Design a protein with these regions (language model features):
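Conserved glycine-rich cofactor-binding loop
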Residues: 10-12
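C-terminal substrate-recognition "lid" of short-chain dehydrogenase/reductases
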Residues: 210-238
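Conserved glycine-rich Rossmann-like NAD(P)H-binding loop of the short-chain dehydrogenase/reductase
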Residues: 26-41
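Active-site helix of classical SDR
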Residues: 120, 157, 165
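Substrate-binding pocket helix/loop in short-chain dehydrogenase/reductase
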Residues: 96-97, 101-109, 201
Length: 243
């Protein structure tokens, strides 16, 4: 049974990824920061799609290193190591730089960048020691590649994710573990719903529309296939042709 952890999978892109991987036969371990019921609902949906036993959803704050380690170590002690991890969960706290407060900077960096370390540190060595030729996919963003007005903190964090992915991919390549990033553009999620002038944003996208969570999930699912075993250290953009 190939178990895959998908963080932030109670809604949005994370849930779409979880459901798509379940359709491909993976036993998906769902996760939420707070909403345990929603995460377990995702886990139940995944079990129906995959035909695999329903996995207990995990609940932890990625910025809390001790809590992340405790939850993951307990899960692996009971169920074994993961075949793959999709690091999707993240936060944003947008503001123009002159009024960007230190707390908003810390919140985003601690969750979106340091949280990636907190998540992967407990799971990578069990993958290596069990000779699992697995998959790690981290969600970055168009902001992490090109930057975005009002998102200095978020852009910095997501750029850092790309750097971490590229370095970790080199370290794990000889183990057969691939490490890649997927960088969505504007996707139809709760975050996109807060855009003040959506039509202006749509006109800036060559395809003249926002992407869907399912389109992002399809790219992640490809990276989990056997055919993608030679794809590592890459950043795949899903942005409708923004650049």
């Amino acid at each position: 049974m190939n178990r895959v952890l998908v963080t932030g999978s109670s809604r949005g892109i994370g849930k779409a990824v979880a459901l798509r991987l379940a359709k491909d036969g993976f036993a998906v371990v769902a996760h939420a920061v707070r909403n345990a019921a929603a995460a377990q609902e995702t886990a139940a949906e995944c079990a129906k799609l995959s035909g695999q036993p329903e996995q207990k959803a995990l609940v932890f704050d990625l910025a809390d290193r001790a809590a992340v380690a405790a939850a993951l170590e307990a899960d692996m002690a009971a169920n074994g190591p993961f075949f793959g991890v999709v690091a999707n969960a993240g936060v944003n706290a947008d503001a123009p730089f002159p009024i960007l407060e230190g707390d908003a900077w810390d919140k985003v960096i601690d969750t979106d960048l340091t949280g990636l370390y907190n998540l992967l540190k407990p799971v990578v060595m069990p993958m290596v020691s069990n000779r699992i030729r697995g998959r790690i996919v981290a969600l970055s963003s168009v902001s992490g590649i090109a930057g975005n007005r009002g998102q200095v903190n978020y852009s910095a964090a997501k750029a850092g994710v790309i750097g971490a992915v590229k370095a970790l991919a080199v370290e794990l390549a000889k183990r057969g573990i691939t490490v890649n990033a997927v960088a969505p553009g504007v996707i139809e999620t709760e975050m996109a719903a807060s855009i003040e002038e959506p039509e202006l944003v749509r006109r800036a996208i060559p395809m003249r529309r926002f992407g869907t969570p399912e389109e992002v999930a399809g790219v992640v699912a490809f990276l989990f296939r056997d055919e993608a075993a030679y794809v590592t250290r890459q950043v795949i953009s899903v942005n409708g042709g923004l650049f």
